[in-house]
């Protein structure tokens, strides 16, 4: 008979960097002053409404909700008072009936502290992924249990929520984080982890992540072993995932005057230096920023970008698709 395998319970818990460096208090939340001021007011005893946090991904919506709840409730009653759900995992009406409603009906856990708010909080992340039927059921729960329960709803697209849910919440838009704040946060993580990266490389990671700080931190963690190994070839190869800024600038400047052979040569350079999707997006964005594309052609160019991206992601030849993109781009803006 085989002996049971021993389990090492003393092994340290391994956390992803997004969890390890998630803001622990409201003061750690960056660039969302309006939301932080309101939540600090609730900590000091002001009325707490149902809340709706919306805005781009990676801007601190979930972190702000969790940091607020950690400061609001002592650790010994935190799990009795806070329910954290991700609606994208369970989109239907069952999650409302089985989890949200049952938690709302449960009695408040006892606390010896007089200053602890006599409420429960339900954090519902990615609520815009819920079906309309589930949202309607949730609206009834919000109404029925408003004396004992507050909801913090989190989504990227507020337009996907039904009006009766939106009207019952105080809305707060989370702004996109400026580049300097993202680079500063990434630099703090690099220093703490002993990961050598220049500011230019951090900017490349940030550009690749398209303003999503959570995605940037995940990218940084996956890149860390390569950086620590000292393998410059692997380092440069990985960082090509965020397109070369100088190359994109050269393409945008020469696209109007270049002939077909020159565009073919540019395409070969792009294929060697960049990922196709990242290049197409950043090239389009730069031309928009420089007002090269007029209002009449924005729709045409948007369709071109989407078509080329889909072809590349579906596995079509990268060089041919980039050539098609550049030639069509030149024809459109001339």
Swiss-Prot record:
Q: Which GO terms describe its biological process?
A: DNA repair; DNA replication; DNA-templated DNA replication
Signal peptide stretch:
none
Give a yes or no for keyword ATP-binding in this entry. Answer: yes
Question: What would you give as a GO molecular function for this chain, any one?
Answer: ATP binding
Write the protein's name.
Replication factor C subunit 4
Residues that coordinate or bind ATP: 55-62
The text of the family note is: Belongs to the activator 1 small subunits family.
Q: Which GO terms describe its cellular component?
A: DNA replication factor C complex; nucleus
User: Record's Gene3D superfamilies?
Assistant: 1.10.8.60, P-loop containing nucleotide triphosphate hydrolases
What is the scientific name of the source organism?
A: Caenorhabditis elegans
Q: Describe the protein's quaternary organization and the partners it interacts with.
A: Heteropentamer of various rfc subunits that forms a complex (RFC) with PCNA in the presence of ATP.
Function noted in UniProt: The elongation of primed DNA templates by DNA polymerase delta and epsilon requires the action of the accessory proteins PCNA and activator 1. This subunit may be involved in the elongation of the multiprimed DNA template.
**PANTHER family in UniProt:** REPLICATION FACTOR C / DNA POLYMERASE III GAMMA-TAU SUBUNIT (PTHR11669), REPLICATION FACTOR C SUBUNIT 4 (PTHR11669:SF20)
